[in-house]
Amino acid sequence: MDIIVKYIDELLEKSTPEAPMWNIEKLKQGLKSKWNYIDGCMIKAVLEMYAISKDEKYLKFADDFIDYRVAEDGTIDGYSIGEKNIDNVNAGKTLFELYDITGKEKYRKAIDLVYSQIAIMPRCESGNFWHKDIYPNQVWLDGMYMGQPFYMEYETRFNDRKNYDDIF
């Protein structure tokens, strides 16, 4: 475990919201960092490190990272609902935990924003969300990981489980 902690700590020390080292290929291509599923996976892992260790540096990093992207009105820099891309829902999973811990109302507003994408996502005849608007009628396994847990969490917490039948 020590080697993992050391690796994660070094990675975080070298990372900022503008230049996360775990997403180095974007930096090498000269692309601006934006709201994305890779950062969502990593920040979720950082929050798990906090939950396990109770070391505030992990919470601070995760909060600073997501806080950088989320405006007070809940809008998210680099996030476009219009893309209809289920990948973009993944980072939204971090908002629930950060909202619980910090109480920042902007995180609650951002949760609602990400949830609003669920309502407009195109679907296959079977009811599954398309992976992306640009891939009609395609369902990808990682897309289910990206979207369904967020959808379920939102329904459980904020919508009286009204759409559970849609999720199952």
Segments (PLM) and residue ranges:
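Carbohydrate-binding/catalytic loop surfaces
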Residues: 21-37, 44, 85-98, 129-146
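Blade-loop segments of beta-propeller domains
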Residues: 63-100
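Well-ordered alpha-helical scaffold segments within catalytic/enzyme domains
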Residues: 40-55, 90-104, 148-160
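Amphipathic, non-membrane alpha-helical segments in soluble helical-bundle scaffolds
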Residues: 32, 59, 81, 108, ...
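Surface loop/turn signatures of beta-propeller and other carbohydrate-active proteins
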Residues: 6-13, 24-25, 75-80, 130-136
